[in-house]
């Protein structure tokens, strides 16, 4: 089986490829032949991609139709992680998010349709729903995105599902809660705070810090995505959550305690525009249909994540110096 994985030099995509290889080594899955397509933007790290004979890396843009067509011609299935994901950057540069997240997804869908490739697993986010005060969202909740990032992801979700409804393409959509774990680019809250605290620096906290997020270890996310790929139904949406809800203030307190420092290192900053107050996913469908359950205890997972960043300065220190530019240097010419 030939599997095309987009965005697999990034945080979640690379962990997914590792997940597949580990499942193969343990005999849980037949060995796939994996092609990774990644543009290597500022957040892409070629070293994240496993150095394995089963994995081929192709540097390229998902919006490059001829390239995508040539790769899709050799593929049996697709798992699509590639996306611009940072909310703050989407507010200042929305065009980049529309081009990659919407137009890039369209290019992939067109090529998959031409070559009869499926399933096409489209990986998305809980942010497409907006904000929920109480309870949790089911998969049929109407989308109400509040940032250019989440609007671009909502658009790509709807586009992907339309290819199933219009053309019969085997599209399956996953929507996850906030991820954390090793190899996460240090612009996101957990690695930003952890690396700042390791360096004795201050950490920023938006607004009153009472925005609530549900936390999901990246390995549990990868487990859920692969269950959808192998057992999910065409045209369906599945939620993949971690089950641990924390305010940003609570999360900050946990990280401060882990480093033995007080709140005097926290800088309150003005709240982000359109900052969603609370996210929460109802994951009963994935549990009932696929047997999905998160396996990682949050306290253990966050402790191991801190240890990983403490032990891997050589990975994250160069990344914190990178400008948020169009692309990182290729292998051999950079960190």
Swiss-Prot record:
Question: Does this UniProt record's set of keywords contain Protein biosynthesis?
Answer: no
**Gene Ontology BP terms:** antibiotic biosynthetic process; nucleotide-sugar metabolic process
Details of cofactor binding: Binds 1 NAD(+) per subunit.
Q: Which reaction does it catalyse?
A: dTDP-alpha-D-glucose = dTDP-4-dehydro-6-deoxy-alpha-D-glucose + H2O
Give the matching Pfam families.
GDP_Man_Dehyd
The UniProt function text for this chain reads: Involved in the biosynthesis of the two 2,6-deoxysugars, dTDP-L-oleandrose and dTDP-D-desosamine, attached to the macrolactone ring oleandolide to produce the aglycone antibiotic oleandomycin. Catalyzes the dehydration of dTDP-D-glucose to form dTDP-6-deoxy-D-xylo-4-hexulose via a three-step process involving oxidation, dehydration and reduction.
The family note in this entry says:
Belongs to the NAD(P)-dependent epimerase/dehydratase family. dTDP-glucose dehydratase subfamily.
Q: What is the protein name for this chain? A: dTDP-glucose 4,6-dehydratase
Please report the organism this UniProt entry assigns to the protein: Streptomyces antibioticus
Name the gene that codes for it: oleE
